[in-house]
Amino acid sequence: MISISDTAQAHFRKLLEKQPDGTNIRVFVVNPGTQNAECGVSYCPPDAVDPEDQHLPFSGFDCLVDPLSAPFLVDATIDFVTDQMGSQLTLKAPNAKMRKVADDAPLIDRIEYVLMSEVNPMLAGHGGKVTLVELTEDKLAILQFGGGCNGCSMVDYTLKEGIEKQLLEKFPGELNGVKDATEHQRGDHSYY
């Protein structure tokens, strides 16, 4: 469910040494399955353990996950990176905003999942997002851009060279292409 790198495990062990005996870590999602989902890591003292919590054993500590957060933390990774700028703990949970869909789920659900878990996190760096409006009988995904992508001069490139290539690669033979249904209005919100 959750992968914790060796460096992150060492970091947690060091932090937990300063806590009361029996303290572990808890990984959780606030507002799971929504666009406002946020992940977090906290200390979990013994008196805060719920009988329904999942216990994931690691070297020197356990990671506890509540049953509501668990399906949204599938494929989550925690890493601890040190560089010239300092140290940083990263938690990546690609399914926090949307549960992972089955490989045999309807195409529209699988496309939506890829947009939410892979495409939108990249667009979010520019304040943008994309949503699936419809899937046509001709196997075209009709998309709508929002935020910083609306009116951006690079939107055609993003659509054809980024999103379309990625979706066609993931769904060969099931999808023929993508089209933009956005009425673009250039403004201060536009990224480029």
From Swiss-Prot:
Entries under InterPro entries matching the protein: Fe/S_biogenesis_protein_NfuA, FeS_biogenesis, FSCA_dom_sf, HesB-like_dom_sf, NIF_FeS_clus_asmbl_NifU_C
Positions annotated to bind [4Fe-4S] cluster: 149, 152
Q: Which cofactor does it need?
A: [4Fe-4S] cluster
- GO BP annotations listed: iron-sulfur cluster assembly; protein maturation
Q: Which Gene3D superfamilies match?
A: Fe-S cluster assembly (FSCA), HesB-like domain
Keywords assigned: 4Fe-4S, Iron, Iron-sulfur, Metal-binding
Q: Which Pfam families match?
A: Fe-S_biosyn, NifU
What does the entry's cofactor note say about binding and number? Binds 1 [4Fe-4S] cluster per subunit. The cluster is presumably bound at the interface of two monomers.
The lineage's top-level taxon is Bacteria
One GO MF term on file is: iron ion binding
| Assembly mode | Homodimer.
What is the purpose of this protein?
Involved in iron-sulfur cluster biogenesis. Binds a 4Fe-4S cluster, can transfer this cluster to apoproteins, and thereby intervenes in the maturation of Fe/S proteins. Could also act as a scaffold/chaperone for damaged Fe/S proteins.
Task: Give the UniProt family note.
Answer: Belongs to the NfuA family.
Q: What is this protein called?
A: Fe/S biogenesis protein NfuA
Traced from the root, the source organism's taxonomic lineage reads: Bacteria, Pseudomonadati, Pseudomonadota, Gammaproteobacteria, Aeromonadales
